[in-house]
């Protein structure tokens, strides 16, 4: 599973490259997820030196492709990789599989939630503009990301903010999700992904209140408990919902019993959502 070696600088990648083997094979659902360096790390494990060293690859491929979208270099890289990739698509292996239907459910915040959102937005707007004036846009990125993260959390529920002042749970998303589950989880099963553990905790609480059996795991769940949860969801007709943290459950999972997937909060990288 080559998800583990996509970062060429990581210890895992370096350790894997030291393994002595006659044959090497990488398996991945998304070989290219973050940037072109994902490909470099995997190919460097399979055929060390084929794409040159890191500096050569950066100058020759990564910068021209990722930064400037140069078609010629994309095509050159594609031709280099082509003989080493065995690719199967859904069309080839599962013709009977229905198309994925995506629906974006827009939720309008109610008064209390909107009030908290506006207060944080105004506060961070002043803070960000002040930081940009003092340090320039380049050095203000952390403050901007901080502000965006807070607003994203409030969109889920102000209750999940990690602040000294605790806010009550006003969440239009949770209300909508509960309505969706009630309507759709009759003869169906659903996966629910969120990047925020606080939001997953609120959903857990709601499912318990509504008497809906579910399974759960996040990054802290041990491998045996994770496997137990997977088997129960797959094989137990009573268990209709699986709550999963987006980063922990986005890869290396086959949950074929589910036919609904809810992504509660969008991730920065669309490829992570696609994987989920």
For each predicted feature, which ranges?
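Residue-level signature of catalytic and energy-coupling elements of molecular machines
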Residues: 2, 28, 81, 110, ...
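RecA-like P-loop NTPase motor core
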Residues: 39, 79-126
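Conserved Helicase C-terminal RecA-like lobe
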Residues: 95-118, 132-253, 257
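A short beta-strand element within the Helicase C-terminal
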Residues: 38-41, 253-266
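Conserved P-loop NTPase motor "coupling/switch" region that bridges the ATPase
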Residues: 4, 10-93, 133
